Amino acid sequence: MKLFFTTAMALSMGLMVMGQSQRLVLAEGFSNASCGTCASQNPNYNTLTAANSYPNNPAKLVAIKYQTNWPGTDPMNAQNPTDIASRVSYYSVSGVPWGALDGTAYAGSSYSGALANLNQTTINNRYAVTSPFDLMVQHSINPSMDSVTITVNINCTDTLQLGSGVVKLHVALTEKTITFSTAPGSNGETSFKGVVRKMYPNGNGTT
């Protein structure tokens, strides 16, 4: 089986500022292979995020998924429970499916954070907000596919007045598509998109 991995990254900040760089929006989703509502919301959500992601031009966002260990069985969570738990704790996620765009829960006619709330207008509006940083990532996977080297270069393109500990870098290794011959959980899903496999150095990020 050939695996396709993506390195996704984000800077989380305690201060909203205007910058001079093009933003690449981060769409974070929380799901579970045994969640019936997840199976209902994921198809449209995955189609929408894929339409706005590389290789489409312009690529407006990067979409990543955290597979939780509840409400039922999920082997993808079992592969990396610690990093996922830290992101669940960070957002105080109490139910799935749930998601956030650049750290803010999806808003709309459904419950706060519902994946069904995300729409093209929301993506376009967020994409139009400039970023105070330029980020460049280079990664290489060794031939045996058991390790990856990631280099991140960050350039501030706007003046920021930030104290120590306010800015954090989050780096995630995601698998583009995971396909099972039979559903690994109880909701019938067999294909999973943008699943977070590892966060570096962990789910808490680097200050």
Where are these predicted regions, by residue range?
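Feature targets compositionally biased, intrinsically disordered low-complexity regions
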Residues: 13, 18, 28, 187, ...
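Short, conserved sequence motifs used for protein processing/export or organelle targeting and
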Residues: 58-207
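Bacterial Sec-dependent N-terminal signal peptides
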Residues: 1-22
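Intrinsically disordered, low-complexity boundary segments flanking structured domains
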Residues: 11-12, 45-53, 87, 119-127
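Local sequence-structure signature of Cys/Sec-based thiol-disulfide redox active-site neighborhoods
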Residues: 20-68
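A generic structural signal for short, solvent-exposed coil/turn residues
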Residues: 11, 19, 27, 55, ...
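The N-terminal extracellular segments of secreted preproproteins, especially immediately downstream
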Residues: 11, 34-37, 155
